[in-house]
């Protein structure tokens, strides 16, 4: 579990730093696209794998919108490693027992903060969002 926490801390440093430094550059069009991706994250009628892939797509697009290719690549790499951890927690569990959308409940607040051009608030909500990963068990 320590390695998972370290990866989440790494993601927070990368994603939070990108949002803090470049979040105000994200356009309304990009936020609209992120909202569409988030709709997929909020579905409870999908498999855990489908849910994870939607969440991964949201975070990758969020960081891509910040416009730093190196951070973008590092987040993708880290998300790849976290896919294995997520699989251990969720895959094979009956989707009727899960409320997968709960671990994406902060996405809307992140996007709202970005619309307000409030990068600090977006980072605060990102921290809460990443914290939900460790609550999966």
What name fits each language-model region?
Residues 14-42:
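Amphipathic alpha-helical dimerization/coiled-coil segments
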Residues 31-35, 52, 72, 123:
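Conserved positions within tetratricopeptide repeat
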Residues 1-9:
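HTH-adjacent hinge/linker in prokaryotic transcriptional regulators
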Residues 49-53, 73, 98-101:
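Amphipathic alpha-helical packing segments from all-alpha helical-bundle domains
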Residues 36, 42-43, 57, 87-137:
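C-terminal all-alpha effector/ligand-binding and dimerization domain
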Residues 9-25, 57-96:
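Hydrophobic, amphipathic alpha-helical faces that serve as interaction scaffolds
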Residues 6, 20, 43, 64, ...:
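Surface-exposed charged/polar residues within alpha-helices that form helix-capping/stabilizing sites
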């Amino acid at each position: 579990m320590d390695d998972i926490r370290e990866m989440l801390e790494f993601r927070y440093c990368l994603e939070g730093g990108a949002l803090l430094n470049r979040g105000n550059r994200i356009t309304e069009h990009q936020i609209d696209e992120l909202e569409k991706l988030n709709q997929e994250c909020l579905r409870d009628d999908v498999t855990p794998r489908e849910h994870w892939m939607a969440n991964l797509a949201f975070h990758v697009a969020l960081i891509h919108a910040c416009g730093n290719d190196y951070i973008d690549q590092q987040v993708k790499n880290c998300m790849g490693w976290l896919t294995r951890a997520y699989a251990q927690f969720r895959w094979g569990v009956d989707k009727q027992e899960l409320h997968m959308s709960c671990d994406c409940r902060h996405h809307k607040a992140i996007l709202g903060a970005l619309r307000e051009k409030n990068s600090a608030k977006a980072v605060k909500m990102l921290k809460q969002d990443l914290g939900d990963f460790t609550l999966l068990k």
